[in-house]
Amino acid sequence: MNYESVISGRDLNKKYKDFNLNIPDLEIPKGFSTALIGENGAGKTTLIDMMVGIKLDYKGSFTYFGKYSNTELEKNPAVKERIGYTGTGLYYLPQWTLKQAREVQELLFADFDGRRYDELCSELAITKDTAFEQNKKVSALSDGNRTKLMLAGVLSRQTDLLILDEPASPLDPLMRDKLCDIIRSYLASAEGERSVIFSTHNIADMEAVTDYAIIIEHGEIVEQGFVEDLKEKYIVIKGESKDAEAARKVLYSFSSNNYGFEGLCLAERLDELAGLDISTECPSLSQIAIAVMKNNTVLR
């Protein structure tokens, strides 16, 4: 599929003492929801911090919205205001009240919609519309409610790109489902002009809202593509124990018990299993991601 890129990267490299992120080529499609998937320490947050300008001491370059460079992101407020970001660290000062958090954003962002912010705080069950609640401090909120408060902030602005680092992690199952609805509504509101990038290891919970997946292990992209294309590239194989060893050499991932075996196979290699008593299924993104990660990690 041909597509425009909302963010592209070239020769990206960031070194730590015991970790190296190395991505020669990065293309994130415009108008879609892209998931950065990987285990803890794979490099997802490092990549996001580089994208949004939190980390500047790296090699390589980014291009935003097809025309703006890293330097323009830093020096041109109009470019930065097109991007909404939430991270895993402190977004609001702990001593701020909820009312102060609203007031600060009204000062910082010309396009901040205070009424929309209040509506989202209520809709996301962060606060009740009382004076007591408005004077509650950020430090008094649960991790989940702090995340929801960050989401309310970025969704109250007129952005073209949301970059969300692990937004689902502190949320309960119902709120993760709500987050998926919010992302879909955000994308649908601008007919292909808005994009979302988020990192996750809650693959199953976020699959419904993932259009494009980038799987990262040890600081490198090990698989990527539109989810529907990945589901055509791979296929789930199931069979009886008697055929397990014969099938194993073809399978991308493999697990077995007393009753049979299951694994993921590249669809192009399915013919190599001819003659075995097997059944096939379309894989979920979660099955694909776990299999790919297992093939690129010590946790097998």
Regions found by a protein language model. Name each.
Residues 60-79:
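Conserved ABC transporter NBD signature motif
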Residues 1-25, 30-32, 73-75:
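A short, flexible loop at the N-terminus of ABC-type nucleotide-binding domains that lies
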Residues 162-166:
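Catalytic Walker B motif of ABC-type/P-loop ATPase nucleotide-binding domains
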Residues 52:
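Helix-to-loop junction immediately C-terminal to a conserved catalytic motif
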